Amino acid sequence: MDNIKRVILKLSGEALAKKEGGYNDELIENIANQVKTIVDKGTDVGVVIGGGNYWRGRSNDNIDRTKADQIGMLATIMNCIYVSEIFRSQGLKTNILTPFECGSMTKLFSKDRANKYFEKGMVVFFAGGTGHPYFSTDTGIVLRAIELDADAILLAKAIDGVYDSDPKINPKAKKYDKISITDVVDKHLGVIDMTASV
């Protein structure tokens, strides 16, 4: 990580949840401590959190897709508020930016504002995805990484790697030890939103 000056971390909402519901505070504290080690070495860290622990709107045919995605955006904001508070409790300075106004809970995203927070040594949480329906938080993280000249994107999902099919559905799914983003796209592996991967 010595040559990486800025990284954007994507955390799956599902990965942060306990099986019985709620948040896995021990896991989040562990992540916070790992992030603190990186920040203390001078690396800027941005965080995007999915909303899957609250909402999987695409699985509900009774709700309009736009409305379902808006609910998902709100779920990411709730996750960022919670996780940023756990990060603060572990000695990190944080701030939350969203692509739309949220009153006093967050600040409106701008590249200048994010860079100002990074200069102050803050972990910057990017909530609300892109602010538009039909785009996942995977797309949101790529967008923020491009806008902010990030050196790397790290994905922490609710699964331990990339498989040739969904291991939750197919117990014989083959795990890849190494795979390029080109192969992920060509094989339609679904580990990341296709819009984000291209």
Predicted regions and their residues:
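N-terminal glycine-/serine-/threonine-rich phosphate-binding loop
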Residues: 1-44
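Short beta-strand segments
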Residues: 8-12, 49-50, 97, 126-128, ...
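Loop/turn-to-beta-strand initiation segments
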Residues: 42-46, 121-123
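Active-site phosphate/oxyanion-binding loops
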Residues: 58-66, 101-123, 133-198
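Glycine/small-residue-rich loop that forms an oxyanion/phosphate-binding "nest" at active or ligand-binding sites
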Residues: 60-106
